[in-house]
A protein has these predicted regions:
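N-terminal beta-strand motif that seeds the catalytic metal site of vicinal oxygen chelate
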Residues: 1-20, 82-85, 142-182, 245-255
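An N-terminus-focused feature that recognizes amino-terminal "leader" regions
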Residues: 1-128, 136-139, 146-150
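Conserved active-site tyrosine of GNAT-family acetyltransferases
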Residues: 22-27, 99, 185-186, 266, ...
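Acidic/polar loop patches that form or flank catalytic/metal-binding clefts of enzymes
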Residues: 35, 179-181, 193-197, 222-223, ...
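A cross-kingdom feature marking solvent-exposed beta-strand/loop segments within repeated
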Residues: 37-47, 65-84, 102, 106-121, ...
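Acyltransferase donor/substrate-recognition loop-hinge adjacent to the catalytic core
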Residues: 129, 133-172, 192, 217-224, ...
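Beta-propeller domains
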Residues: 171-222, 226
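Conserved small/polar residues in nucleotide/adenosyl-binding loops
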Residues: 305-311
Length: 315
């Protein structure tokens, strides 16, 4: 029994080469509203960050302002990608103390941060690759995000596309690393195995993978852990690990109340989609039975959005 509770995903921070440009894309194409900012104007001399929000989803898009920083090295090595997956907790100090006592490596100890809107407590630990988890306790904070960020007063309001919350966050591992990472989440956080598949379940003639989904107690947090399996061609998981130069977040899945409307809106905003083979839809009814949606509408490309790392998946 943990001495703290993880309530939900708090936010994901992406390290990107141009935070301002990325923020523009997330607003104009994905419907995220910029709500907070941190940079030179707020006293941050090493990094600039834009906080983007749509319903319950928050992304922090950050870029370095000076050379030779850990953030700059991360971008040089991995390209644009997810650095931190943060959890909203009821007690940061207990979360940090318990996870580090169980073997997690600390990045930063619990720290009280405050401004005129109140106070929050944050702490960070390492997970696989160069990825981290930050515990965020904001029980006594009334601002839009966290102390140190100023509210963004923007003239142009984003047009939401129907994204509601983060459904799951997927981490890709080198071959043989999936089980140790899952053991880490079970030991450090007390999470349980929610679902699993092997190469017999997720495979094609050319590529395959193994996956275990780890979840917290209330199952608001789901983190599939993938590793490559042998196929006639290189697994997409292995391709990611080689391109990213190690383990990391492959994609962030976000829920939509009406995925058809969401996808249509995204396409009208200029988001590109990878095509789904027509053969998938030709056998769909035989595989899953009758359903209400118009198959002619479904057969339009609706799978993964074609973005820079990490890919975004709609569910």
């Amino acid at each position: 029994m943990n001495s703290y509770k993880i309530n939900a995903f708090d936010h994901c921070e992406l390290y990107v080469s141009n935070a301002k440009q990325a923020a523009h894309y997330y607003r104009s194409c994905l419907g995220f509203q910029p709500i907070a900012y941190q940079g030179l104007e707020t006293g941050s001399r090493e990094k600039v960050s834009y906080v983007m929000k749509q319903n319950q989803v928050r992304f922090v898009l950050s870029s370095p302002l000076v050379p030779g920083t850990e953030m700059g090295h991360h971008i040089d090595k991995h390209g644009d990608g997810v650095k931190d997956v943060s959890f909203a907790v009821d007690h940061t100090e207990n979360a940090w103390k318990e996870t580090t006592e169980r073997g997690a490596e600390s990045v930063s100890e619990p720290k009280l941060i405050e401004d005129e809107k109140g106070e929050a407590i944050v702490a960070t630990i390492k997970t696989y690759g160069d990825t981290t988890h930050t515990f965020v306790e904001r029980n006594n904070y009334k601002g839009v995000f966290l102390p140190g960020y100023q509210v963004m007063d923007v003239d142009m309001v984003a047009d939401p596309v129907g994204i509601v919350h983060i459904d799951h966050v997927v981490g890709n591992q080198p071959d043989g690393a999936m089980q140790p990472v899952c053991d880490f989440y079970e030991k450090i956080f007390g999470w349980h195995r929610f679902w699993s598949v092997d190469d017999k379940d997720v495979s094609t003639d050319y590529t395959s993978l193994r996956s275990i989904v780890m979840a917290n107690e209330n199952e608001k947090i789901k983190m599939p852990i993938n590793e490559p399996a042998d196929g006639l061609k290189k697994s997409q998981i292995q391709e990611f690990v080689e391109f990213y130069e190690g383990a990391g977040i492959q994609h962030i899945a976000m829920s939509s109340r009406d995925i058809i409307k969401t996808v249509k809106k995204l396409k009208s905003n200029g988001v590109e989609f990878l095509p789904t083979p027509q053969s998938y839809y030709d056998t769909l009814i035989a595989r899953v039975g009758e359903f209400e949606e118009d198959i002619n509408i479904l057969s339009e490309p609706v799978s993964y959005t074609h973005l820079t790392l990490p890919t975004i998946l709609l569910v």
